[in-house]
């Protein structure tokens, strides 16, 4: 499907409230300096309006707003204010450094809030809206009014509140689904009817601010756009009060991917989405779940064999957007118990192995057996499987025993030779590895001069394995080999045998020795 939109496509304004509503999420508070760092990222992301804070609530918020105002000159910087004169005056003062300031005033309108929170009548609410929007407009030309709990407000009264706010000078009307109560059909109809019927609606921007209590924040925001909203309020990673807000990464990519359907776009620089998401995760210490849309670790990961096979044929079979479009480097083929042979073979090719049919079959059988022991198979695991497959033509490690003999070590190794016979040898050395390599040299008849030897861990947690890497010389020629095992001494033996077996195969085939590197 064609997801592109023309240059004449209408544009939605993205109002990011990560630094205000998002920060209200428990555990997500930020210092003024952290807010400035996040605001810079939102600016680079292309956000149109950044809600910077609630100045009347704290000195910290006032400081953060002033810092952002001095530095960020492109986006509109908004601050939240209750319908109180002192709040509005404080907010206006906090915005004095901003190049493009916006005062965002709000008042509850639903019967539940009027009765139990405000203790105000309809008439008192209307009077307060008129008075405080007028006051705000006296300070700043760009004024947004939010009818808190709009989706639980009687629609006739909501229409009257909207009319009064527009008449008083509001330039944006926000109709929030404050508690995530509404449904897409309801909010689409609400926006459509109010925009069609309220006097002056054609002179302002209508905005949606949807919470995620029922998991519908993005769906409701999209429906509001269908109903005529031209601003969406959202947060990075969907953080916010309770279950959070409409997620910026989800709403913007929905509009981009389904551009032919919505025929509306945003100015978001989508390749910066993932880095912005990860920055927020670091700042507030709240990681997103792996299956989070767009920015989760599994968003572009495929393990199912059927899905992997389709992806190898054409990525569009199981991906509706490119990972590069949102800032991921590429899709991930996660190798695990659900993976098929095609994905394993493709990954082996990427690691540099060109296998015959029988070799692929053997490695895949070993791969499936390994999947019964651990959840994910890494590249190092595949390399270890390749080692097992390739050494079958040469010596194989049957057993080994390492023991201390005073200040020295003793190694006993038992190998299976290419004909299947058992060969056992012992050797002493200055340490377990020195003794081990001496015993292997005696058993195989191959003499190797060790240049370097390294060990490190590969994999994660209980699935971690030890990898041994060595560089050796034989007849003046350098060789490299690796071995992987749960036991690091065994990994060292496998690395040594990797080189020895290749040397023996070269000797049998009459291959002239030269520098070679093995990944096994």
Swiss-Prot record:
Listed GO MF terms: 2-isopropylmalate synthase activity; acetyl-CoA C-acetyltransferase activity; manganese ion binding
Biological function: Catalyzes the condensation of the acetyl group of acetyl-CoA with 3-methyl-2-oxobutanoate (2-ketoisovalerate) to form 3-carboxy-3-hydroxy-4-methylpentanoate (2-isopropylmalate).
Pathway(s) per entry: Amino-acid biosynthesis; L-leucine biosynthesis; L-leucine from 3-methyl-2-oxobutanoate: step 1/4
Chain residue ranges for the region called Regulatory domain: 396-520
Family: Belongs to the alpha-IPM synthase/homocitrate synthase family. LeuA type 1 subfamily.
UniProt-listed SUPFAM superfamilies: 2-isopropylmalate synthase LeuA, allosteric (dimerisation) domain, Aldolase
Cellular component terms (Gene Ontology): cytosol
Subunit structure: Homodimer.
The EC number(s) this enzyme carries: 2.3.3.13
Keywords in alphabetical order: Amino-acid biosynthesis, Branched-chain amino acid biosynthesis, Cytoplasm, Leucine biosynthesis, Manganese, Metal-binding, Transferase
Record's protein name: 2-isopropylmalate synthase
Cofactor: Mn(2+)
Gene3D superfamilies assigned: 1.10.238.260, 3.30.160.270, Aldolase class I
GO biological process: L-leucine biosynthetic process
Stretches of the chain forming a coiled coil according to its record: none
Ligand binding (Mn(2+)): 21, 209, 211, 245
Superkingdom of the organism of origin: Bacteria
Catalyzed reactions per annotation: 3-methyl-2-oxobutanoate + acetyl-CoA + H2O = (2S)-2-isopropylmalate + CoA + H(+)
SMART domains xrefs: LeuA_dimer
Subcellular location: Cytoplasm
